[in-house]
Amino acid sequence: MKKILIVDDEKPISDIIKFNMTKEGYEVVTAFNGREALEQFEAEQPDIIILDLMLPEIDGLEVAKTIRKTSSVPILMLSAKDSEFDKVIGLELGADDYVTKPFSNRELQARVKALLRRSQPMPVDGQEADSKPQPIQIGDLEIVPDAYVAKKYGEELDLTHREFELLYHLASHTGQVITREHLLETVWGYDYFGDVRTVDVTVRRLREKIEDTPSRPEYILTRRGVGYYMRNNA
């Protein structure tokens, strides 16, 4: 049974989410401020965190930033603010996805399922689920899918699940330009609720970790107005 940590200082909202998630078969633990969130995270080791942006004591952005120092657990951020700035900051600090309040149970369930599904290594297109995926070497970048590890110059990179999945998908289709919409559907696991800005932010975050000079990328390149691709001979 997958365990969800719900962090929201508004108890009615927390109770509704808990009820719906429990009904879907998840184990649920709750926290009502940032300090409790960090304590519950350490004690319960959840499979996914639903994290409100506005929290007392320690805000959601700081909670996400702290958790990301030691864990790549999927984080779904909730926000009453519908500003692009808050969404981008949340993603850059390590959140995997966001939902703007008010939201429907259907939307939240879809996002949680997508994050949990994508938090496990997936076979590349056409590969049998029970076969062992082979490592991919592109220049000085090595991707080991069965270990969920990426290395640069032999040193392991600190990637979140989402960043790894995006890198792995692009590396599995070197030279092929992939649209933001396709990446959103394939890597994030949904196409109806998503925002392509999420892809752009994650690509930028990934470049900062794998590129020697992120402003002049050698691995993940942009085809303006279309999408992204992994260079064949980076």
Swiss-Prot record:
It holds the Pfam family Response_reg. PROSITE patterns: OMPR_PHOB, RESPONSE_REGULATORY. Residues 3-116 form the Response regulatory domain. It is found in: Cytoplasm. InterPro entries: CheY-like_superfamily, OmpR/PhoB-type_DNA-bd, Resp_reg_WalR, Sig_transdc_resp-reg_C-effctor, Sig_transdc_resp-reg_receiver, WalR-like, WH-like_DNA-bd_sf. The keyword ATP-binding does not apply. One of its GO terms (cellular component) is protein-DNA complex. GO terms for biological process: fatty acid biosynthetic process; negative regulation of DNA-templated transcription. The keyword ATP-binding does not apply. Member of the two-component regulatory system WalK/WalR that regulates genes involved in cell wall metabolism. Binds to the promoter region of the transcription factor fabT gene in the fabTH-acp operon in vitro. Inhibits transcription of fabT, probably acting in an unphosphorylated form, thereby playing a role in the regulation of fatty acid biosynthesis. Essential for normal growth in vitro. Required for maintaining normal cellular morphology, acting, at least in part, by regulating peptidoglycan hydrolase pcsB. NCBIfam families: resp_reg_YycF (NF040534). This is Transcriptional regulatory protein WalR.
